[in-house]
Amino acid sequence: MTTPSKFRDIEIRAPRGNTLTAKSWLTEAPLRMLMNNLDPEVAENPKELVVYGGIGRAARNWECYDRIVETLRQLNDDETLLVQSGKPVGVFKTHADAPRVLIANSNLVPHWATWEHFNELDARGLAMYGQMTAGSWIYIGSQGIVQGTYETFVEAGRQHYDGNLAGRWVLTAGLGGMGGAQPLAATLAGACSLNIECQQSRIDFRLRSRYVDEQAKDLDDALARIARYTAEGKAISIALLGNAAEILPELVRRGVRPDMVTDQTSAHDPLNGYLPAGWTWEQYRDRAQTDPAGVVKAAKRSMAVHVQAMLAFQKLGIPTFDYGNNIRQMAKEEGVANAFDFPGFVPAYIRPLFCRGIGPFRWAALSGDPQDIYKTDAKVKELIPDDAHLHRWLDMARERISFQGLPARICWVGLGLRAKLGLAFNEMVRSGELSAPIVIGRDHLDSGSVSSPNRETEAMQDGSDAVSDWPLLNALLNTASGATWVSLHHGGGVGMGFSQHSGMVIVCDGTDAAAARIARVLTNDPGTGVMRHADAGYPIAIDCAREQGLNLPMITGKR
């Protein structure tokens, strides 16, 4: 038996147009989105199946990828494919409204939910890290997090700077699949940004895709550019090659005062995602094979230094927040007792949106035609005519965001509006206004689909941060409601042992059957977010539940 391979020198792109390569659009859609996750315009390291986030993969190995593709092409519309940590393990007879694919990635019994145990399983070919949208086949490149990052920066501007970020600058690090959204989000919010990244290839990627505007040659040059652009009120993003664990302490030593500090390095995965200070990337990858425990220790030591610098900025009164990569936890484990003195971005800025079921609604055009996305942009404006903030986002997205792979759009909307938009998109497919079906999905980072005490569910007012029944219920309800594919993952965003989360995708193929499924899924999915926050006692969520007619027996009293 040949050894399964995680490397293949190949380029993959999803088919375009309206010609099927599978038996229906319900199986063509997951096939194209799986391939799109591995498009070289989309994935961080597609030849090793890595989509984003350290080692977040789309399939366990290339043999599994081949068999998934083969199976999806043969799958009937009354069958369901089961995928276990990136490996296709079964096809079962179900029914037309059941999901065509059910995915479980990286899930471990809690006592064994550690990176050490996971890495052992991964090395033996028994597991795969799915991150959030890597293993659930709905990653759309950095755009997928741009609006969430933009909303965070805008809200921080409202809270700290009277809603005006002109002449202000953000200090951050990480230009990978997620962190790469930061420079563009800051620019769209009106601020300059200094973005530290330890790999030149990632800086080059963001420069090519226009997510970052310029690269400075060194720290002095970067600070000179920041000073010039902030004085002129220009929102320009600057990349700097270097190590955040070295540069942030130097900025503190120099007395430099950013206007906002955060971080989006892959600190959740010390073995694969965070370069120790003083090391080259080549040393880091080589030693990860020969001395993984030593690498983890060195990376976490550097994270501790990084967080201490962030704490120093906070002590100066500078708004400082964690952007969900678990760096505070890593620093705390290295002895930084007050690592959690600065907040995470969700309790600080995003939770009121979650209380209304508002989160990262996204869709992709299976046709590959950008015009299909532009037509849906116009439909969103037509159906939501009075939301100037949303209209501004769509205008900026069209102007500044380069599509990666299949054209796609991210748009934060909540309960009520998601179903309205989904049904409208389905009608556009039916009428021929769109040239092929649309898939609608979301990040697992949503209001009802994740339990993550150091990120999305940090500081819940009832203390239910670590209760993970909610994403399980979300996945079960989306399955019962007829989503086209449903996923249930562990460890995304913050690493092993720190999160559980679920995802869903539904196809708009223009049929009546699709319309019925869309109405159920795109109501019930955000409805679980309102339910979860109402159950925790948030008045905004309770009011939303009543306004939207949710039947929450312990809260709304509806029978």
Swiss-Prot record:
Pathway: Amino-acid degradation; L-histidine degradation into L-glutamate; N-formimidoyl-L-glutamate from L-histidine: step 2/3. The active site is at residue 411. It is an enzyme of class 4 (lyase). It is found in: Cytoplasm. GO terms for biological process: L-histidine catabolic process to glutamate and formamide; L-histidine catabolic process to glutamate and formate. NAD(+) binds at residues 53-54, 131, 177-179, 197, 202, 243-244, 264-268, 274-275, 323, 493. This is Urocanate hydratase. It comes from Pseudomonas paraeruginosa (strain DSM 24068 / PA7).
